A protein has these predicted regions:
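CoA-thioester-processing core
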Residues: 5-58, 86, 90
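C-terminal long alpha-helix characteristic of the crotonase
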Residues: 19-24, 74-123, 136, 152-154
Length: 154
């Protein structure tokens, strides 16, 4: 059994992709120590929502990988013996993408949180895709696709 508590859970909440073993257990244990999960709070609320944070922070109860997955803290869960292979597959998938595109996707996801869909936002995102399409990484990626070869970053 693998335990992740307090700041470790907050670290998971800040990660782009989380894979957990079915044997993993989680706990927001700060209240047991007379503390509050203040530093990790913003990440937890974004990952699992305020209602779930309230429950698990005030009770300090332990929960398993299935609940962590249901809450959105964990993206994928697998048998303990399959953990390395599952992580490797995700790392390979990310590594196969354009490095600038990956950075741009991460930045865009962060910038869109909480923003309503307005004309201004539509204009910003249209400008972004136009700028990216004209860049060297996108040109290489599209050429590689059309030529049936791997792009240079792979």
């Amino acid at each position: 059994m693998i335990w992740t508590s307090s700041g470790g859970v907050g670290l998971l909440a800040a990660c782009d992709v989380v894979v957990a073993s079915e044997a993993a257990r989680f706990c927001l244990s700060e209240a047991r120590l007379g503390l509050v999960p203040a530093t990790i709070g913003p990440y937890l609320v974004r990952a699992i929502g305020a209602r779930a944070v309230r429950r698990y922070a005030v009770t300090a109860e332990r929960f398993g990988a299935a609940e962590a997955h249901r809450l959105g803290l964990v993206h994928e869960r697998c048998a303990p013996e399959a953990l390395d292979a599952a992580v490797h597959a995700i790392v390979e998938a990310i590594a196969g993408n354009g490095p600038a595109a990956v950075r741009g996707c991460k930045r865009l996801a962060g910038e869109l949180v909480g923003r309503p869909l307005t004309a201004e936002l539509r204009e910003e995102t249209a400008r972004l895709i136009a700028d990216v399409r004209g860049g060297p990484e996108a040109r290489e990626g599209m050429a590689a696709f059309l030529e049936g070869r791997a792009p240079s970053w792979r």
